[in-house]
């Protein structure tokens, strides 16, 4: 008696994981790439709109952000009002300063920061807005 086995009946002794590893590496690459863009992130601020205004020439400037919650950020790092004061004391008065205030931020917070800049003699101060 002759027993013939077809190829379909062959027992699988182990699973081939190479395709799984390939897919995982592709997914890891995608996640790391998108995480880089997210990590650069910005502080979520909704800029007010204005009909007038002009584009500012890109140069090394200090960006002060005021959120609608009243938090102050200096170069994407949250700081207290006192820390901002200390930083501005050491800064060259000719350095351009950009105020990036949320349109729903309290006017009081904006005025405090703007007054501080005037108090220390900063003349090159810009308010960032979104063009209508």
UniProtKB/Swiss-Prot annotation:
InterPro entries: ExbD (IPR003400). It is found in: Cell membrane. The chain crosses the membrane at residues 18-38. GO terms for biological process: protein transport. It is a single-pass type II membrane protein. Residues 39-132 are periplasmic. It comes from the Bacteria. Residues 1-17 are cytoplasmic. Involved in the TonB-dependent energy-dependent transport of various receptor-bound substrates. Belongs to the ExbD/TolR family. The accessory proteins ExbB and ExbD seem to form a complex with TonB. This is Biopolymer transport protein ExbD. It comes from Aquifex aeolicus (strain VF5). The gene is exbD.
């Amino acid at each position: 008696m002759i027993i013939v086995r077809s190829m379909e009946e062959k027992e699988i002794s182990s699973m081939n994981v190479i395709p799984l590893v390939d897919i995982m590496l592709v997914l890891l690459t995608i996640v790391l790439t998108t995480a880089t863009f997210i990590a650069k992130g910005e502080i979520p601020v909704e800029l007010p709109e204005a009909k007038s205004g002009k584009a500012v020439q890109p140069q090394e400037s200090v960006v002060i952000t005021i959120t609608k919650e009243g938090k102050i950020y200096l170069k994407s790092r949250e700081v207290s009002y006192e820390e901002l004061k200390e930083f501005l004391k050491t800064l060259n008065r000719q350095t351009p300063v950009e105020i990036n205030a949320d349109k729903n931020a309290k006017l009081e917070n904006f005025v405090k920061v703007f007054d501080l800049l005037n108090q220390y003699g900063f003349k090159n101060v810009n308010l960032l807005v979104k063009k209508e």
